[in-house]
């Protein structure tokens, strides 16, 4: 061989030879690496026939021994390798067939699989019997080795009659029994391995089916959300409730629960499929073409994808902000990402389970079977698919079939009362109205779009005239929906009118009592006297109400008391005791009790004539005055009724005209005597000093008044002293407390808002004297 051709020589089994074979080049010269030496030996030493014959004989013997050895010692290993190869190939073909039949791959991924490994697509064709997993019957059939051993055993028995001796049967039986046990154990292991592969194939089929069902359910959910938005927006525009821009401001308010469920489930499934694909790329690498990162979405960072897709969990508020309130465009983008990622996962799994990547016969072991790879790759992906599918299905069925589920109630009309049947009729009418309006809205939207096209286009008059009959036909198609909507509306109105009439008839029947035990009949309220809002309400009325001892414990509900804590109960008790103490001090300072007639006179004095819209009746003055009192005085008079009766039955001695006298009792004794005098309202004779101030006793000295001397009433010919001057004449005892002084000051201020004028009944001369006194006051 000349040196100029050395560059074109390729040695067999060299790296260059293997590389060229992989590239498909076969048109080159092949030279064996051991060929030059024998050629050189032959040319230099010449032919030697005896050594050649020896070498030939040795080669034949070696080949014969190797054949016998391989047939005797390696038959079991070859059988095992063949069985594992059948299981491996059958599982791979069944898995590829499942992936292709479930239609979980996009068209782009199918084309990429055809480019990378065309044998994968052939697995999707109807498979032959050799392509499936071997069945248990095929695994249990005896092979050539078993048959040969059986024939050898039978021939041995025939050739040696001595083997038929009874003593040798035990030995042959034990040998045969051990062989059967070994054979059954091997068959059981093979069957167990076959069942495991079948179980993982079913799991892969379920995972692919769940992925496809989840994709279809997300597509239905998005369609339902879109239809709801379009219908609600259309009804808003038709009803002219608000503008289009205002209607489109918050589209996420429709089916917000379904939107959240779609976002959560799609996000979880996307993350699980992404992690599984990255795990395959990292732990099970293939060739450079299959592992090219430009063909995978899973290598794109989360930040570039957006929409809250990250490994960390995010709150609902963050997801709402990142998706613009779970808007429909954001959910559609997320759905497209999920579809691409799911298809990418199954594409990579198909490449990994391809028969081209199956290990060769000697290297194939039970640990390298593809079901281990499938279990390691998927891990928690099937559980994520099934959980997300169940969650989204519940949410979708709730929002889609909520009314349908309620519509199933009229199926039991025979067992339901008349009220339920009528309500179901109303529901049926409203449901029919909704369906007709939905169909009507779709037709109107299509017609509106066509009219916009006709308006915007610059067509000739002839083409426009041809379009008019088409518009007329479409309007006629809309007419049945309008008529059906009107009939459904009238039916619903009539059913509701029947229910209303029946309800009013039941309410209008006499003798229908209220069955609620907590319902109490309201008493008839007597018409109150209306007072003009020009003069302030006298504070004396409030003081009189405060002075009276109101039974707070009786008005306090015991039911509410048990709901209070221990601290609240103690606090209320302290407040009640403090209120009683203040009331007793007020009574000791302002300790006077007036009779009903006296109260009537005080009310007439406090309220001017122009403040009352309706005049007081002279026949029943007590009743008319009691009607004109505020609500707080009515409660006070009920409490003081007993004290009033005692005062009217036992008047003060020497005082014949109680209407002209005001008693102010100041006792020098301690608090208990004050409380007793305040509770009874009686004057203590002789034990305490009593100051009796008459309205016409101006000439009387203050010393006599302080001594407690009482003078008989004289004719009222003097001017009336003001209330502030009379209160100033009071000599307060040293035991007068701060709160009592404050109450006295408040009483003085409240009584100084008007000039008191006395009125008596029955004596005309006294009335004339009163008028004369008023004139003198005006002159001064």
Swiss-Prot record:
<dbReference type="GO" id="GO:0005912">
    <property type="term" value="C:adherens junction"/>
</dbReference>
<keyword id="KW-0966">Cell projection</keyword>
<dbReference type="Pfam" id="PF12632">
    <property type="entry name" value="Vezatin"/>
</dbReference>
<feature type="compositionally biased region" description="Polar residues">
    <location>
        <begin position="624"/>
        <end position="643"/>
    </location>
</feature>
<feature type="compositionally biased region" description="Basic and acidic residues">
    <location>
        <begin position="647"/>
        <end position="663"/>
    </location>
</feature>
<feature type="compositionally biased region" description="Low complexity">
    <location>
        <begin position="702"/>
        <end position="711"/>
    </location>
</feature>
<feature type="region of interest" description="Disordered">
    <location>
        <begin position="757"/>
        <end position="780"/>
    </location>
</feature>
<comment type="function">
    <text>Plays a pivotal role in the establishment of adherens junctions and their maintenance in adult life. Required for morphogenesis of the preimplantation embryo, and for the implantation process.</text>
</comment>
<feature type="compositionally biased region" description="Acidic residues">
    <location>
        <begin position="761"/>
        <end position="780"/>
    </location>
</feature>
<keyword id="KW-0968">Cytoplasmic vesicle</keyword>
<dbReference type="InterPro" id="IPR026858">
    <property type="entry name" value="Vezatin"/>
</dbReference>
<feature type="transmembrane region" description="Helical">
    <location>
        <begin position="162"/>
        <end position="182"/>
    </location>
</feature>
<keyword id="KW-0812">Transmembrane</keyword>
<keyword id="KW-0175">Coiled coil</keyword>
<dbReference type="GO" id="GO:0002142">
    <property type="term" value="C:stereocilia ankle link complex"/>
</dbReference>
<feature type="region of interest" description="Disordered">
    <location>
        <begin position="620"/>
        <end position="718"/>
    </location>
</feature>
<feature type="transmembrane region" description="Helical">
    <location>
        <begin position="140"/>
        <end position="160"/>
    </location>
</feature>
<dbReference type="GO" id="GO:0098794">
    <property type="term" value="C:postsynapse"/>
</dbReference>
<keyword id="KW-1003">Cell membrane</keyword>
<dbReference type="GO" id="GO:0005634">
    <property type="term" value="C:nucleus"/>
</dbReference>
<keyword id="KW-0472">Membrane</keyword>
<dbReference type="GO" id="GO:0005886">
    <property type="term" value="C:plasma membrane"/>
</dbReference>
<dbReference type="GO" id="GO:0098609">
    <property type="term" value="P:cell-cell adhesion"/>
</dbReference>
<feature type="compositionally biased region" description="Basic and acidic residues">
    <location>
        <begin position="690"/>
        <end position="699"/>
    </location>
</feature>
<dbReference type="GO" id="GO:0001669">
    <property type="term" value="C:acrosomal vesicle"/>
</dbReference>
<dbReference type="GO" id="GO:0043009">
    <property type="term" value="P:chordate embryonic development"/>
</dbReference>
<keyword id="KW-0217">Developmental protein</keyword>
<keyword id="KW-0965">Cell junction</keyword>
<keyword id="KW-0539">Nucleus</keyword>
<comment type="similarity">
    <text>Belongs to the vezatin family.</text>
</comment>
<dbReference type="GO" id="GO:0017022">
    <property type="term" value="F:myosin binding"/>
</dbReference>
<protein>
    <recommendedName>
        <fullName>Vezatin</fullName>
    </recommendedName>
</protein>
<keyword id="KW-1133">Transmembrane helix</keyword>
<dbReference type="InterPro" id="IPR026859">
    <property type="entry name" value="Myosin-bd"/>
</dbReference>
<feature type="coiled-coil region">
    <location>
        <begin position="430"/>
        <end position="467"/>
    </location>
</feature>
<dbReference type="GO" id="GO:0060074">
    <property type="term" value="P:synapse maturation"/>
</dbReference>
<dbReference type="GO" id="GO:0098978">
    <property type="term" value="C:glutamatergic synapse"/>
</dbReference>
<dbReference type="GO" id="GO:0060171">
    <property type="term" value="C:stereocilium membrane"/>
</dbReference>
<comment type="subunit">
    <text>Interacts with USH2A (via the cytoplasmic region); the interaction associates VEZT with the USH2 complex at the stereocilia base. Interacts with myosin MYO7A and the cadherin-catenins complex.</text>
</comment>
